[in-house]
From Swiss-Prot:
Entry GO CC: plasma membrane-derived thylakoid photosystem II
Keywords: Coiled coil
Superkingdom of the organism of origin: Bacteria
Single biological process term from Gene Ontology: photosystem II assembly
TM stretches of this protein: none
A Pfam match: ThylakoidFormat
Coiled-coil ranges from the UniProt annotation: 201-223
Membership in a protein family: Belongs to the THF1 family.
Purpose of the protein: May be involved in photosynthetic membrane biogenesis.
Region of interest called Disordered, as start-end residue ranges on this chain: 209-228
Protein name: Protein Thf1
Key word Metal-binding present: no
Length: 228
């Protein structure tokens, strides 16, 4: 994205790409995500990598889980990508490749490469290791909440294969943060905050659904009570 584009430009581009109304509580969700990503990718230190891609898709899928109609979720994501000048296809390809590495290759090897404790041979794991080494050795790296979500998602994929406990997972996360020169406490706070946001959205949707059901019952009762 060119740095000359503003947040307002991105918002206008989104509404041009997706002119349909967005349902209730999700309007704010999409607006905040668009602003967050815009500010991130226009930062001069930002570099696209598979963990950003994984984090963005993880965030979007989790935040929009309850959105209806379901078939519009993908259309909204495509509009966001258009507005932010991101490649929808590249995001999915990058995320799918790293999720597959974490799920399909030996979990211990993946976890050691992620923590900088093993040099991978050729193939997919080496590509992951090279990317992480580049981040660890970068003079200027733009950390983001989306990066932390991507990191946590890949760690979760590998953790399932290794049958890790929550305690083990957090210890692994701390090791990876040390290798990548990230503040573990900040990463943990960002992950906890994201989960709290998901809980608030879930509760808000439950309230909206309950109000809708109550209103529908009232309409049905009025219809029954009215003389034919």
């Amino acid at each position: 994205m060119t740095s000359k584009r503003t947040v307002s430009d991105s918002k206008r581009a989104f509404f041009a790409a997706y002119p349909r109304p967005v349902n209730s509580i999700y309007r704010r969700v999409i607006d905040e995500l668009l602003v967050e990503v815009h500010l991130l990718i226009t930062n001069q230190d930002f570099r696209h990598d598979p963990l950003f891609a994984t984090g963005l898709l993880t965030a979007y899928q989790a935040l929009m889980e309850g959105y209806t109609p379901v078939e519009q979720r993908d259309a909204i994501l495509r509009a966001l990508c258009t507005a932010l000048e991101l490649s929808y296809e590249q995001l999915h390809t990058d995320a799918a490749q790293w999720r597959a590495i974490a799920a399909e290759l030996p979990a211990q090897e993946v976890l050691e490469v992620m923590a900088g404790k093993r040099e991978a041979g050729d193939g997919r794991l080496k590509a992951m290791g090279d990317t992480l080494a580049g981040i660890a050795n970068a003079e200027r790296f733009k950390y983001s909440r989306l990066f932390s979500l991507g990191l946590a998602n890949i760690l979760e994929q590998a953790g399932r294969a290794a049958a890790m406990s929550e305690k083990d997972r957090l210890e692994r996360l701390q090791q990876i943060c040390t290798y990548l020169k990230l503040d573990y406490n900040r990463v943990k706070r960002d992950l906890d905050f994201f989960h709290s946001v998901l809980e608030r959205i879930k509760r808000s949707k439950e309230v909206v659904d309950e109000l809708s059901q109550t209103e529908r019952r009232k309409r049905e009762e009025r219809a029954v009570s009215q003389p034919g």
